[in-house]
Amino acid sequence: MKKQLRSSFSTQGRRMAGARALWAANGMKKEQLGKPIIAIVNSFTQFVPGHVHLHEIGQLVKKEIEKLGCFAAEFNTIAIDDGIAMGHDGMLYSLPSRDIIADSVEYMVNAHKADAMVCISNCDKITPGMLMAAMRLNIPTVFVSGGPMEAGELDGQHLDLIDAMIKSADESVSDEEVSKIENRACPTCGCCSGMFTANSMNCLNEAIGLALPGNGTIVATHANRTQLFKDAAKLIVENTYKYYRDGDESVLPRSIATREAFLNAMTLDIAMGGSTNTVLHLLAIAHEAEANFKMDDIDMLSRKSPCLCKVAPNTQKYHIQDVNRAGGIMGIMGQLAKAGLIDTSVVRIDGMTLGEAIDKYDITSPNVCEEAIKKYKSAAAGKFNLVLGSQDVYYKELDTDRAEGCIRDIEHAYSKDGGLAVLKGNIAQDGCVVKTAGVDESIWKFTGPAKVFDSQEAACNGILGGKVVSGDVVVITHEGPKGGPGMQEMLYPTSYIKSRHLGKECALITDGRFSGGTSGLSIGHISPEAAAGGNIGKIKDGDIIEINIPERTINVRLTDEELAARPMTPVTRERYVPKSLKAYASMVSSADKGAVRLID
């Protein structure tokens, strides 16, 4: 059944003369009146290398849409660079910005009654924020990311942002060497080159079904990234007419992002050792979609999904550009499908089922198309470059080695245990998360005395000051969604542990979270958090912490009676919390529920 255009409320009828006059002042031509209005939700900013190249691409998408007869209007969202906001109180704003982005998209699209939208996202909180908005609005939507940064190179070795952070804190590394690394770590526009949060989310968007193949892995500088934007423009027009003219609801975000799609996305995340932040974001997006996807589902999937792909920071051998050469996300999904670990019947924005898309785009499929071959041969150029789509270098050959290549088959998995795990115990009754793909198997079982800090800053000072020694478990409390507030990323503490050469000799646990760039025995999202009365807030220096990844447990060696009788450890830090973050803290849920705002 034909649907009424939402935009007709501002373009049709005598009483809308004023609105039509304003639309005309926005550039709408008379022949475009009554045609679908498609919002272009851009996230261009000159604060973030993952977004610095998006200035003109929104207008390219607008031109492509308007060639096909619709009217397109662009607006921007905020975007925070977690790497620049890291290590100071700017990080308190990062996770809350996800909800601000979701709200701003909802406000703009509903206020102006747009009929559909193209979301141009890229970095950490922007993609999930836009996805949350898409679930709320439930209008035809296509996502296309700005693409990953090329990996840096020094002395024939790949490097990235995390190398710069670790080496700069290592006193044995000279200033000259640090300068060399700093100047080569981030050579192009795009989101940082490892399987960090931004790239993880852009890859998962392919699995959810709201982005086209190649969205997560074709580098930002390649011409085929520009082609993705053109393809997205064409597709959003097709899907807009499918919904409003033909009444086809299969193109709507909630029809695509079902429980099964979230299970597929999480299975992919586990298989590729993605960022632990994706757990927060998938839970939050599913909450907005009203899909029945919970922390227990993640625990269940982590016990049966193997690790099929290892990328920085879990290894320095491969970066996202190498995943693309190995067939991208469809390459990983193809191996998961062969093992029966994903539901291939789910639908996608391109009208195919996931199974049909795998058959067409998995480079090991006998039916792989030429378009797929071209996408996945898209290579890094190896030059400093801040311009989207400005190079067309191609690999001579694809990486189809599923035994020893970047992407493995089930038989040759990096580990039978997946790349992420949910642990529970008496200091995490509602769960916590560890990226097992980044943990050396020699410390999957770890027991040690606690060194407790009530802030990230105190932990950094303690680690660099020599208070943390081999065998310790660093415990950082009151950094959860409420306690921070804002649930800071603990990338600097984990980097400093590595800079002290303790990466395989210490653990770190927190009710805060970690950057996608974190590796090592780093356990976050402990729920309930200290600020909500969680037992992590009762741990004292010297308490023995027991971590067992194979058994999925984490405990402090105290009886239930001892824990119940012990008071919360007083918070000694001094931290100014502005009203905006106090408002966030008053509404936010625990990490095991995605740190969503709880609003009746």
Curated annotation (Swiss-Prot):
Q: What does this protein do?
A: Functions in the biosynthesis of branched-chain amino acids. Catalyzes the dehydration of (2R,3R)-2,3-dihydroxy-3-methylpentanoate (2,3-dihydroxy-3-methylvalerate) into 2-oxo-3-methylpentanoate (2-oxo-3-methylvalerate) and of (2R)-2,3-dihydroxy-3-methylbutanoate (2,3-dihydroxyisovalerate) into 2-oxo-3-methylbutanoate (2-oxoisovalerate), the penultimate precursor to L-isoleucine and L-valine, respectively.
What organism is the protein native to?
Answer: Bacteroides fragilis (strain ATCC 25285 / DSM 2151 / CCUG 4856 / JCM 11019 / LMG 10263 / NCTC 9343 / Onslow / VPI 2553 / EN-2)
Which residues catalyse the reaction?
S515 (proton acceptor)
Question: Which PROSITE patterns does the record associate with it?
Answer: ILVD_EDD_1, ILVD_EDD_2
Output the superkingdom of the source species.
Bacteria
Quick one: a GO cellular component term?
cytosol
Q: Which reaction does it catalyse?
A: (2R)-2,3-dihydroxy-3-methylbutanoate = 3-methyl-2-oxobutanoate + H2O; (2R,3R)-2,3-dihydroxy-3-methylpentanoate = (S)-3-methyl-2-oxopentanoate + H2O
Keywords from UniProt, A to Z, are:
2Fe-2S, Amino-acid biosynthesis, Branched-chain amino acid biosynthesis, Iron, Iron-sulfur, Lyase, Magnesium, Metal-binding
| Residues found modified as N6-carboxylysine | K125
Subunit composition and interactions: Homodimer.
Q: Which GO terms describe its molecular function?
A: 2 iron, 2 sulfur cluster binding; dihydroxy-acid dehydratase activity; magnesium ion binding
The Enzyme Commission number assigned here is: 4.2.1.9
Give the required cofactors: [2Fe-2S] cluster; Mg(2+)
Tell me what this protein is called. Answer: Dihydroxy-acid dehydratase
| Cofactor comment text | Binds 1 [2Fe-2S] cluster per subunit. This cluster acts as a Lewis acid cofactor.
State where [2Fe-2S] cluster binds.
Answer: C123, C192
For this protein, the record's NCBIfam families field holds:
ilvD, PRK12448.1
Asked whether the keyword Iron-sulfur is assigned, the reply is: yes
Write out the residues that bind Mg(2+).
D82, D124, K125, E489
Similarity comment: Belongs to the IlvD/Edd family.
